[in-house]
Amino acid sequence: MSKKQFYLVREDMLTDAMQRTLEAKALLSAGKVRKINEAVHRVGLSRSAFYKYKDGIFPFHAIAKERIMTFSINLADRSGTLSQLLNIVADTGANILTINQTIPLQGRANITLSVDTAPIEIDINELFERMEALESVERVELVGSGS
């Protein structure tokens, strides 16, 4: 599994496509446009570039205020797997808010886990690493965040 890292980067260091993606996201969140197609057209960005970067680039103020993170986790269907995963999250000091698990199909289950990270005692990168280090974890993705 690839290790996910998070960085704080000055705006002038971002590629043009990344900067335009941020502009398009700002238009959408402010309600100045209703559709992605309108936003990318207004900022002069292709839809494919927008979709490439939209889930991976955020303004710093948006991340700094985020407390609740939602993860999508693919697990192998083995006894005790979910319990091990929840223990890893709880051991960081994070507060588990919601857990949704699909019925295991073909030996795999998907878990959606919402976590309050305000009380967390480690770096978010470390949390990702610990979850991904579980032998039964096949994939961990951050699918959303909010306050």
Swiss-Prot record:
Instruction: List where the protein spans the membrane.
Output: none
InterPro entries of this UniProt entry?
A: ACT-like_dom_sf, ACT_dom, UPF0735_ACT_dom-cont
Q: Which SUPFAM superfamilies match?
A: ACT-like (SSF55021)
Question: PROSITE patterns from the entry?
Answer: ACT
Q: Name one Pfam family in it.
A: ACT
Q: Cross-referenced CDD domains, in alphabetical order? A: ACT_PheB-BS
Q: Where is the ACT domain?
A: 70-145
Q: In which family does this protein belong, per the annotation?
A: Belongs to the UPF0735 family.
> Which NCBIfam families does this UniProt record tie to the protein?
PRK04435.1 (NF003361)
Q: What is this protein called?
A: UPF0735 ACT domain-containing protein ABC1543
Q: Which organism is it from?
A: Shouchella clausii (strain KSM-K16) (Alkalihalobacillus clausii)
